[in-house]
């Protein structure tokens, strides 16, 4: 395999080309990209955990250091001012020397407010990209050049097309997340609480809670019906029914986002439903290809949900077509089939149809779908269908003309299990779809 250093060199060349095009289109001389700053908790003297500007980590795998600055013009070697204070209160990251530093000019920045004297004197034509607009104004950046929408739209659109370096990083993130999922399943099988399962996951991935790309969803039993459940009970339930784990990892700033669901017993209806959702998810991925709208795959999976609702007699005496047409599948899968993935978990540009930022909203029937793009080579997306038993969504169907088609007794029996979600991360190639998750043999 090609080394990360050579892949990174090509990655920088791609970013330089995109930058040249963006600067020419919007008549700017350079972009000043800010890693971000620490922000203190209200009325306190300690900061919130630092989260780096994703446009910054697109260029350099520096994810834990605030007060850094990148100056890029698409022609000259990118210039990185790396924050290196004299500080005996806090850990100070050393000046980096790694696979990527040959392609970036790295300069120590001893004082957070010292960047002003190091930048070009003429700044009227420099664009600022970062989370602290007031800092840009202090540096003399024109207000109209602070996070300019056209530039961001352009950069975001092309972030959809991953370089080989980015794909290599995402495959490494997959490996870490897969290790975590295996450790978490073992912890579940041994009867641990959600809190302790989460610790097992973090230990296996080598992450802290603040390192993972999103808060882990560690849901036992009925908690699996809460789509973004992050509470973490300290006490294990008296009886284990099910375990849904939605948890990822990060490598060089790039995310993995995986979900698996397990039944405590292998011989009940729920266990068979888990298997069937898994099989249908794999069957959908097998149909995916470049040139097709992501929306089409979402709609297709509602048809697959209808098939499972009928097979398991959760909905009765109704055709699968009628279920989808009348949205009886909606309360069982209330979220989208997935989303773009990359530097951010819900990566940017899911609705952008071109590099001018033309927006195509999700269909009115499926408002929570996060992507309406035509699939193209280089895109990375999640495929994460589910079936849930959520009372607040089912309640409106308990009355009315369709109520008789719901097998309420079966639904009540399944509610203690919460729900099911199966999520893989896939790469669209010209002639195939790579399933990074299954390639690592995560069942």
Curated annotation (Swiss-Prot):
Binding locations of Mn(2+) 1: 257, 339, 384, 423
Q: Report the cofactors.
A: Mn(2+)
GO BP terms in the entry: proteolysis
Listed under GO cellular component are: cytosol
Q: How does the cofactor attach, per the note?
A: Binds 2 manganese ions per subunit.
**InterPro entries the UniProt entry points to:** Creatin/AminoP/Spt16_N, Creatinase/aminopeptidase-like, PepQ_N, Pept_M24, Peptidase_M24B_aminopep-P_CS, X-Pro_dipept-like, X_Pro_dipept
Keywords in alphabetical order: Dipeptidase, Hydrolase, Manganese, Metal-binding, Metalloprotease, Protease
Which domain of life does the UniProt lineage start with? Answer: Bacteria
Q: Please give one Pfam family short name.
A: PepQ_N
Annotated Mn(2+) 2 binding sites: 246, 257, 423
Q: EC number(s) in its UniProt entry?
A: 3.4.13.9
**GO molecular function annotations of the record:** aminopeptidase activity; metal ion binding; metalloexopeptidase activity; phosphoric triester hydrolase activity; proline dipeptidase activity
* Alphabetical list of CDD domains matching this protein: Prolidase (cd01087)
Signal peptide start and end residues: none
Query: Catalyzes what?
Result: Xaa-L-Pro dipeptide + H2O = an L-alpha-amino acid + L-proline
What PANTHER family has UniProt attached to this entry? XAA-PRO AMINOPEPTIDASE 3 (PTHR43226), XAA-PRO DIPEPTIDASE (PTHR43226:SF8)
Summarizing the function annotation, the protein's role is:
Splits dipeptides with a prolyl residue in the C-terminal position.
Protein family per UniProt: Belongs to the peptidase M24B family. Bacterial-type prolidase subfamily.
The cross-references to HAMAP family, in alphabetical order and at most eight, read:
X_Pro_dipeptid (MF_01279)
Kindly give the NCBIfam families that the UniProt entry links to this protein.
PRK13607.1
What is this protein's name? Xaa-Pro dipeptidase
Q: Which source organism?
A: Escherichia coli (strain SE11)
């Amino acid at each position: 395999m090609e080394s990360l250093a050579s892949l990174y060199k090509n990655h920088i060349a791609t970013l330089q080309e995109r930058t040249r095009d963006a600067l020419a289109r919007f008549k700017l001389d350079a972009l000043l990209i800010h890693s971000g700053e620490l922000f203190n908790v209200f009325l306190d003297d300690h900061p919130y955990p630092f989260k780096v500007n994703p446009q910054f980590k697109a260029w350099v795998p520096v994810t834990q250091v605030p007060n850094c600055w990148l100056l890029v013009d698409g022609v000259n070697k990118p210039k990185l001012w790396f924050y290196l204070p004299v500080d005996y209160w806090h850990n100070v990251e050393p000046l980096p020397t790694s696979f990527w530093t040959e392609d970036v000019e790295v300069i120590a920045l001893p004082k957070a407010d010292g960047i002003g004297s190091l930048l070009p004197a003429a700044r009227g034509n420099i664009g600022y990209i970062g989370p602290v607009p007031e800092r840009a104004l202090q540096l003399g950046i024109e207000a109209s050049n602070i996070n300019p929408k056209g530039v961001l739209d352009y950069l975001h659109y092309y972030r959809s097309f991953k370089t080989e370096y980015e794909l290599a990083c995402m495959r490494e993130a997959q490996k870490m997340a897969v290790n975590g999922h295996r450790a978490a399943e073992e912890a579940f099988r041994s009867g641990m609480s959600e809190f302790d399962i989460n610790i097992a996951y973090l230990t296996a991935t080598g992450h802290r809670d603040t390192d993972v790309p999103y808060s882990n969803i560690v849901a036992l039993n009925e908690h699996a019906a809460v789509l973004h459940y992050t509470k973490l009970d300290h006490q294990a339930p008296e009886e284990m029914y099910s375990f849904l784990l939605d948890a990822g990892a990060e490598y060089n700033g790039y995310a993995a986002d995986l979900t698996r669901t397990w039944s405590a017993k292998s011989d009940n209806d729920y266990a068979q439903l888990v298997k069937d959702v898994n099989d249908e998810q794999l069957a959908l991925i097998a149909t995916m290809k470049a040139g097709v709208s992501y929306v089409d795959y979402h709609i297709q999976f509602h048809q697959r949900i209808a098939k499972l609702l009928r097979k398991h007699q959760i909905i009765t005496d109704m055709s699968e077509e009628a279920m989808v047409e009348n949205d009886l599948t909606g309360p069982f899968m209330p979220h989208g089939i997935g989303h773009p993935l990359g530097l951010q978990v819900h990566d940017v540009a899911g609705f952008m149809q071109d590099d001018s930022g033309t927006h195509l909203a999700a269909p009115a029937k499926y408002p929570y779908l996060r992507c309406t793009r035509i699939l193209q080579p280089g895109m990375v997306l999640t495929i994460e269908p589910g079936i849930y038993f959520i009372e607040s969504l089912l309640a409106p169907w308990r009355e009315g003309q369709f109520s008789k088609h719901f097998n309420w007794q079966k639904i009540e029996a399944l509610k203690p299990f919460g729900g099911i979600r199966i999520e893989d991360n896939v790469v669209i190639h010209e002639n195939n779809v790579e399933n990074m998750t299954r390639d690592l043999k995560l069942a």
